[in-house]
Amino acid sequence: VFGGGIYMNFYERVYELVQRIPAGKCASYGQLALMLGNPRASRAVGYAMRACRTPGVPCHRVVRADGSTTPAFGPGVQRALLEAEGVPFTADGRVELGGCRWDGA
């Protein structure tokens, strides 16, 4: 059942992990799924990010595997938040993951 049980437990685990991503670093949905022990759950991580209403969870630090941002924040909002933290972007508007990918440490 959505909204409880295993889904909420998974979402809580996602939020706890995302809270550990420091300013200036990013992680992909798939990377977080792998860290949570379920490498095929990248879409579920995305659902958790979209559903997040928990203060203090820096959802803007989670991007797609190719470094692209999501329009869920509104046009340009995620990019502005990341740039304010010093996250570099490529000429085509993607996060330069090589320099800012969070390693989970």
Feature map (PLM): residue ranges:
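Nucleic acid-binding interface residues in structured DNA/RNA-binding domains
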Residues: 2-105
